[in-house]
Swiss-Prot record:
Keywords: Glycosyltransferase, Transferase. It catalyses: a purine D-ribonucleoside + phosphate = a purine nucleobase + alpha-D-ribose 1-phosphate; adenosine + phosphate = alpha-D-ribose 1-phosphate + adenine; cytidine + phosphate = cytosine + alpha-D-ribose 1-phosphate; guanosine + phosphate = alpha-D-ribose 1-phosphate + guanine. It is an enzyme of class 2 (transferase). This is Pyrimidine/purine nucleoside phosphorylase 1. The gene is ppnP1. Pfam families: Ppnp. Its EC number is 2.4.2.1, 2.4.2.2. Catalyzes the phosphorolysis of diverse nucleosides, yielding D-ribose 1-phosphate and the respective free bases. Can use uridine, adenosine, guanosine, cytidine, thymidine, inosine and xanthosine as substrates. Also catalyzes the reverse reactions. It comes from Psychrobacter cryohalolentis (strain ATCC BAA-1226 / DSM 17306 / VKM B-2378 / K5). GO terms for cellular component: cytosol. It comes from the Bacteria. Belongs to the nucleoside phosphorylase PpnP family. InterPro entries: Ppnp (IPR009664), RmlC-like_jellyroll (IPR014710), RmlC_Cupin_sf (IPR011051). GO terms for molecular function: guanosine phosphorylase activity; purine-nucleoside phosphorylase activity; thymidine phosphorylase activity; uridine phosphorylase activity.
Length: 111
């Protein structure tokens, strides 16, 4: 279940912005040292067929609104995800994401 809000966190006010502003996220830090990012991805179009994101640590990406297709490095085909679903990407890897609508997500940094 998606948490609608987080309490007792510190928010990094400086956003991470990529793809000319089409993707942005903010990092939140919990008192116990855990980190998560909350982000928004705008739809792909004729200028951006898909987005590619690299991972340094294992990540579980939870889709909180919208729908998208994801192809994790090493996989042959894209898989479909929608709000309420998540996927895991190992550390030192990456994934492609394509979408026709705005996607919001929580990235749980697990490594």
């Amino acid at each position: 279940m998606t948490a609608a809000q987080f309490t007792n966190v510190t928010v990094n006010a400086q956003a991470t912005i990529s793809y000319d502003g089409r993707c942005s996220s903010h990092t939140i830090m919990f008192e116990d040292g855990r980190h998560k990012t909350l982000g928004v991805i705008l739809p792909c179009d004729n200028l951006v067929e898909h987005y590619h994101f690299s991972t340094n640590t294992s990540e579980r990406i939870e889709i909180t609104s919208g729908e998208c297709e994801v192809k994790i490095n090493g996989e042959e085909e894209f898989s479909y995800y929608r709000a309420g679903q998540s996927f895991v990407v190992e550390g030192n890897s990456g994934f492609n994401l394509r979408t026709e609508q705005i996607v919001q997500y929580i990235c749980h940094l697990e490594g």
